[in-house]
Structures are given as structure tokens and as C-alpha cells.
Amino acid sequence: MEVRVQNIRKEFGRFPALEDVSLDIRSGELIALLGPSGSGKTTLLRLVAGLESPTEGTIFFGDEDASKKTVQQRNIGFVFQHYALFRHMTVLDNVAFGLKVRPAKRRPSAADIRRRAVDLLELVQLSGLERRYPAQLSGGQRQRVALARAMAVEPNVLLLDEPFGALDAQVRKELRRWLREIHDRTGHTTIFVTHDQEEALELADRVVVMSKGAIEQVGTPDEIYDHPVSPFVYGFIGQSNCLDVTLANGEIWHEDRPIGLRAGNEPDGAATLYFRPHDVELIDGCGGCLAGLVTASRRVAGTRHLELDLGRKHPPVEIELPPERAASTDHTRIAFRPTRWKLFRKGGQKEAPLIEAEAPVLAATGT
């Protein structure tokens, strides 16, 4: 089922929770709404579900205007963060509940309801637990029951509101892989809300990055991570560093020295340089580079993260190096240069990047 959100505005009192939001979700797509608290992602999900009504704008399911329809009329499957299972019902009865309470004209036979519930429990790998109660299940098992219950009604759209937020890290990782497999097998149009960027990038076909009630960027995980279109997206997705720089005569300067990167034909003036900790190369000497004193070093999985003080009260930057390369750098001065970076002109969060580069394009010169 295709879902189209057109020019949606939602106000709570005088507070604009969403402002002119438009989004096309393809049939069978798994899409993530990602953003910090207060970005509007949960409000958008609730509007699609019919749990809230838009102040302005329209929501289409296929070619049909669903804006005035109830939750039941929209045929939505909803999975919440805290399961919302019926404690007094068995696993099988929880899964079958949505079918059992349908109006008589639309209700399948008891045999068909049981068959579908059993099939879904097999799909979510809970066969044999039909007679257990929620209190007898682990958190991961309860969330699987909640998903099976949502799918039992054969929903037009499946909505997941931070479904793994209450689970520990290892269980979340396992369920993410499992949910992607389930989606690929069933083909439901699925929208899920998360503040966990790793979860969004791993699971989704496309990611919708939201901030302050607006959509900042929509794209595949690769597009979002590798080609962020605004300072907000660059800073929110993954780890990043930003430096105040100056463009002068086609070169990029930090403080009082060029750093070995070209600014192309951009006019002179102030800008911000963004780069990721792993997108750097070390430089012998420092003719046209950045340099800083190592103030902290910590091991993170297969890399070592070094915190560098660039001086002049500038916020520290962080770079990542292989542990063996970083072993000799403790408390020493490191010269480096970004290998992949973006420039944004100062004064506009929405402005497109001035320059996007994947390698330094100006040889180091001078001292």
C-alpha cells in the first residue's frame, strides 16, 4: 500500500509540531523516521495511524484520502515500544485478538483465526509457545508476539513506534536482523520511528531525517550517511567534526594557515568544514594541514579514537586510527588532513553544501 503525506501541518495549541511535511512512501517499503526528541517523528506516525488529525494537509492510502478515516477504517497494524500485550491472554489469544473482535461480517471462522495465529507464530519463530502468557516470555519474545498480533489483521500499513527501545543492546541487534527478514518475506509497507541512527541505517530502505517539525533529508542509508545535505544531518548522523574556516583565493584556511584543501571558485568568506573522524590521513610534518595535541585516547572496538586540541579555545576534534598506528601518538602532536569533507556557508542550516570532496585536492605547501 502506497502512503502519501501531502503538506501536513499539525499544531497542538499554538505549538507547531509539524510544518508543511510531504512524504511519498512506496508500496512494500520499509522506511525509518529518524530524529531527536521533539523532531515530530512520532507525531507524523500518529497522523498516518489516525491517532491524531492534521491541522492542515492530506494523507492518502493509495489513491484514497484517508485523512478523515478512523484507525479501524485505515486497517493499521501498530507495534508499540512497551508491547501492550494482554497479560491475561495466552500468546495465541494475543495474536488472534484483532481478528476475533472484528465485526461478524468481516470476522474469519474460529478455525481460520487459529490457523493464521499459528502460522504467524511460526513466522516469528515462537512455535510451541502458544499457551504461555506474556509474563513467561522474555522481552524479545514479547515484542515478536506484538509484531505477530499487528500482522494478523493483514494491515494496509505496519507502524512501529520505537519497537526495540525497551530491550537491551544485544537483543535489539538480533531483532533488527530478524525484522528485516520478516519484512522481506511479507512485503508490508512499514514505517518505524526511532532515535537510534544505527537502527535506522541498518534496517530501512530509506531514512527520513527530521528536525523541529520538518524533514531535513530523505534518502537511502548510503545517501544519508555519505551525502548529508545540511549541517544538521551531517552532525546528527554518525560522528563528525566541524571547524570554522575561511575561504580565501580558492583555498580553505583554519585560523591563520591553509589546510591543504581547495575551495574551488567559491567566493571568499566564512564557512564551516565538516568531516568524519575516520575520513582523515596523517601527514608527516605540517605544510598545509591541521595539527593538534593528543589529549585523550580510547579504544572503541577495532579502532582507537584520539581527541585532539587544535588550540585557541577551539572545541576538540576526534579522529579514528587503527590501534597499531595510534600506539605511538599518545601525548604527541598529530598533523592530519581530511580526505572526505563538506563545506557549508555560514548562516543557513538549510543551505546546500558549497563543496563536497572525497580527497584532498591541494598539495601541502609551506610550513
From Swiss-Prot:
Q: What class of enzyme is it?
A: translocase
SUPFAM superfamilies from the entry? P-loop containing nucleoside triphosphate hydrolases
What keywords tag this UniProt record?
A: ATP-binding, Cell inner membrane, Cell membrane, Membrane, Nucleotide-binding, Plasmid, Sulfate transport, Translocase, Transport
| Organism superkingdom | Bacteria
InterPro entries listed in its UniProt record: AAA+_ATPase, ABC_SmlMolc_Importer, ABC_transporter-like_ATP-bd, ABC_transporter-like_CS, P-loop_NTPase, Sulph_transpt1, TOBE-like
Q: Can the keyword Membrane be found in this entry's annotation?
A: yes
Q: Which GO terms describe its cellular component?
A: ATP-binding cassette (ABC) transporter complex
Q: Which residues bind ATP?
A: G35, P36, S37, G38, S39, G40, K41, T42
Where's the ABC transporter domain? 3-237
Tell me the membrane topology, using the record's own terms: Peripheral membrane protein
Reaction catalyzed: sulfate(out) + ATP + H2O = sulfate(in) + ADP + phosphate + H(+); thiosulfate(out) + ATP + H2O = thiosulfate(in) + ADP + phosphate + H(+)
One Pfam short name: TOBE_3
Keyword Transport included in the entry's annotation = yes
Q: A Gene Ontology molecular-function term?
A: ABC-type sulfate transporter activity
Instruction: Identify the NCBIfam families for this entry.
Output: 3a0106s01
PANTHER family attached to this UniProt entry: SPERMIDINE/PUTRESCINE IMPORT ATP-BINDING PROTEIN POTA, SPERMIDINE_PUTRESCINE IMPORT ATP-BINDING PROTEIN POTA
Q: What is this protein called?
A: Sulfate/thiosulfate import ATP-binding protein CysA 2
Q: Which organism is it from?
A: Rhizobium meliloti (strain 1021)
Annotated gene: cysA2
